[in-house]
């Protein structure tokens, strides 16, 4: 993208500051007694925003599959590499769906290192994540970042609200990192990806990371069962073929859909243990209306 697209439906001064918009539609009810994915991941990342229920599940999963911590950290490294690579291709707008509790090295920080004018919209539907949004939203004055309380299942609403900050007539990178595993097969995760892709301009991108049991079927199955027995939203591990199919008719960039630790790795991201996730990035060609 050679030029910064004009803001839509907001004055220029609105982009000089960050904001958190609560739709009042879909925020998950706060329940500290039931383990939640965002808080469990925060525990695995060494954060402080979790409760005993989250730690209990997190510790049991770690006992059954110790590599989970390396995998969660590898997913953050994957995020960083994806955003940097797409920024190098000229992308200046990012839609990060299922962002989770804010951590250092978030999407807007990485994108605005490449170009301070970059715009980012974070999407989640968890009340604790929403409560932390203002701490996350510290955009530089030349760019913008916003937080949207929305559910991936309602792609129409999500895209309409995101268009307050992002110009969908220009390239946008949609990040779906470790979020589609929270959607069961009957929720049609691949169909949701297609709906998002169809709304994007040519030269936009879809990035996906997703858990798998391909590398250690027994331990991952046991860890998944323990997690699903206690967590608010269960997860589904999928095969390489199933995850690749989520890209629909889009062609992933080289090296394809691969273990996330080998997707354009940096030396600093080298990990001694494999991560139980595949990842890939695909480019849109043309709108499909």
Residue ranges and their predicted role:
Residues 256-289:
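Core SAM-dependent methyltransferase catalytic element
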Residues 234-257:
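Short alpha-helix
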Residues 179-182, 211-215:
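Short "lid" loop at the C-terminus of a central beta-strand within the Rossmann-like core
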Residues 152-153, 162-190, 196:
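A short SAM/SAH-binding and catalytic strip from SAM-dependent methyltransferases
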Residues 1-150, 155-156, 160-168, 276:
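Rossmann-like AdoMet
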Residues 217-232:
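Short, glycine-/aromatic-enriched active-site segment of Class I SAM-dependent methyltransferases
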Residues 146-148, 172-176, 192-193, 199-211:
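Conserved beta-strand signature within the Rossmann-like core of class I S-adenosyl-L-methionine
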Residues 167, 201, 248:
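Short conserved AdoMet
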């Amino acid at each position: 993208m050679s030029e910064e697209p004009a803001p839509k439906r907001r004055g220029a001064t609105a982009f000089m500051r960050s904001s958190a918009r609560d739709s009042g539609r879909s925020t998950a009810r706060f329940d500290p007694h039931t383990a939640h994915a965002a808080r469990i991941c925060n525990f695995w990342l060494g954060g402080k925003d979790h409760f005993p229920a989250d730690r209990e599940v997190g510790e049991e999963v770690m006992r059954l599959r110790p590599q989970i911590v390396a995998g969660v950290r590898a997913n953050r490294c994957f995020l960083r590499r994806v955003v940097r690579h797409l920024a190098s291709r000229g992308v200046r707008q990012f839609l990060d769906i299922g962002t989770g509790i804010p951590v250092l090295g978030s999407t807007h920080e990485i994108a605005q290192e490449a170009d301070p004018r970059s715009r980012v919209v974070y999407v989640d539907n968890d009340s604790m994540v929403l409560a932390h949004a203002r701490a996350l939203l510290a955009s530089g004055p030349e760019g913008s970042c916003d937080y949207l309380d929305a559910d991936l299942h309602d792609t129409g609403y999500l895209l309409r609200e995101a268009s307050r900050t992002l110009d969908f007539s220009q390239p946008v990178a949609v990040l779906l990192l470790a979020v589609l595993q929270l959607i069961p097969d009957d929720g049609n995760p691949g169909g949701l990806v297609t709906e998002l892709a169809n709304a994007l301009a040519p030269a936009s991108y879809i990035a996906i990371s997703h858990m798998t049991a391909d590398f250690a079927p027994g331990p991952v199955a046991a860890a998944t069962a323990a997690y699903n027995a206690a967590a608010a939203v269960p997860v589904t591990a999928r095969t390489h073929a199933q995850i690749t199919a989520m890209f629909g008719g889009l062609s992933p960039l080289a090296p394809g859909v691969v273990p996330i630790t080998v997707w354009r790795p940096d030396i600093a991201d080298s990990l001694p243990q494999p991560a139980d996730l595949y990842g890939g990035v695909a480019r849109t060609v043309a709108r499909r209306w």
